[in-house]
């Protein structure tokens, strides 16, 4: 394969990842199949970087003319519109299943139900409120830090979520599941590129903030995996969405705490 063909292949995989995780239209020449979607996992972090960057731009463009709370809300709205609430939906389904089911089978069945339950509604409301409040506090501390936090959190949280695919068992047997192709064998190249995207955005941060966030994310990933194993024996697409949302919120927490210390 020539260098040009290799670059074309990587761009193609990035666009597949973008089409899977966002509502951004893909070019007509991009063809999606299970094999491409499987390999596209390497670029999930970069998709997060794109979503975070666009959200941050909206925040930076509006924060001089609008109250911090409104600018943050607009930035969050952009993120939701870009992804179609994909991860938020996973968070709600996961909490409905984990909160309402007694056995792993019950939990998986509830998670597949499209109706929103009380556990899911509470989780969704609290998650959105936490994100808004934490970002407002970061904006009042320093607007540049708040915008950078959006970029970092959207990227790192997706790296944490996608990395679960590489070590854990996919527990749904449904062949029609959108997440099924992701559950197939993942290569070392996918993992290394995924991790590299997370390391890349840490350059936005000062040394202590970057190190603190890295250590917390490693610990959080381990905790999430332990919970998923105990609840359903592995992961599903919904739980990956929940992992992303939780990791994003924790990112804001860490950056706010470290920012107040520095």
Curated annotation (Swiss-Prot):
Cofactor(s) named in the record: Mg(2+)
Keywords from the UniProt entry: Cell inner membrane, Cell membrane, Cobalamin biosynthesis, Magnesium, Membrane, Transferase, Transmembrane, Transmembrane helix
Reactions this protein catalyses: alpha-ribazole + adenosylcob(III)inamide-GDP = adenosylcob(III)alamin + GMP + H(+); alpha-ribazole 5'-phosphate + adenosylcob(III)inamide-GDP = adenosylcob(III)alamin 5'-phosphate + GMP + H(+)
Pathway annotation from the record: Cofactor biosynthesis; adenosylcobalamin biosynthesis; adenosylcobalamin from cob(II)yrinate a,c-diamide: step 7/7
Any one Gene Ontology cellular component term annotated for this protein: plasma membrane
Top-tier EC class: transferase
Membrane-spanning intervals of the chain: 43-63, 66-86, 120-140, 146-166, 191-211, 242-262
InterPro entries reported for this sequence: CobS
An MF annotation (GO) of this entry: cobalamin 5'-phosphate synthase activity
EC number(s) given by UniProt: 2.7.8.26
Major localisation: membrane
Matching HAMAP family: CobS (MF_00719)
Protein name: Adenosylcobinamide-GDP ribazoletransferase
